[in-house]
């Protein structure tokens, strides 16, 4: 799972057809509009993130959520369309979730949805975002090899062997 290579490939493959974009500025604003304003997690996801916070010493929900989201995007399978009950008190805006990377994460989500054959409407993007986020949290929390922050980093770096 080479996240950096994945993002480089993603950015290299995104192209916009000139005939579809008349007013580039308004098109860019529309393209970069987040699919969801407020991100709320399930209680199960909160509990899993609490475990990850303890293990990694990363104390901010949004940073762990970014790791989880990217972990799920790196998985080649489509997340199962399970209902997600957002019953925890963990909530953040899209901008808090993404920070300086919010536009890149949005592009990654859109490219993944396109690759998976999903439409790029706001509702589909929001659903796929929630599914990827929660799946990624589950993957990270369920990984017995993650016992400290270095283990989390090792997942993202290519093997040196």
Regions found by a protein language model. Give the residues of each.
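Short, positively charged interaction helices/loops
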Residues: 74-116
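Glycine-rich, aromatic-bearing surface loops/beta-hairpins
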Residues: 149-161
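Short, basic amphipathic alpha-helical segments that act as recognition/interaction helices
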Residues: 59-84, 141
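Intrinsically disordered, low-complexity, charge-dense segments enriched in Lys/Arg
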Residues: 98-146
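Surface-exposed, Lys/Arg-rich phosphate-binding patches that contact polyanionic backbones
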Residues: 35, 42-63, 67, 91-92, ...
């Amino acid at each position: 799972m080479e996240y950096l290579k994945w993002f480089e490939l993603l950015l290299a493959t995104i192209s916009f057809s000139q005939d579809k974009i008349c007013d580039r500025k308004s098109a860019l604003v529309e393209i970069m509009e987040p699919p969801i304003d407020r991100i709320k997690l399930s209680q199960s996801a909160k509990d899993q993130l609490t475990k990850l916070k303890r293990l990694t010493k990363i104390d901010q929900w949004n940073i762990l959520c970014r790791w989880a989201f990217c972990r799920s995007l790196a998985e080649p399978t489509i997340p199962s369309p399970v209902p997600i009950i957002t019953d925890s008190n963990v909530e953040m805006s899209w901008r808090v979730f993404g920070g300086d990377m919010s536009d890149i994460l949005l592009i990654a989500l859109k490219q993944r949805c396109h690759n998976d054959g999903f439409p790029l409407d706001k509702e589909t993007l929001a659903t796929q975002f929630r599914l990827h986020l929660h799946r990624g949290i589950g993957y990270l929390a369920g990984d017995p090899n993650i016992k400290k922050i270095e283990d989390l980093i090792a997942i993202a770096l290519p093997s040196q062997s």
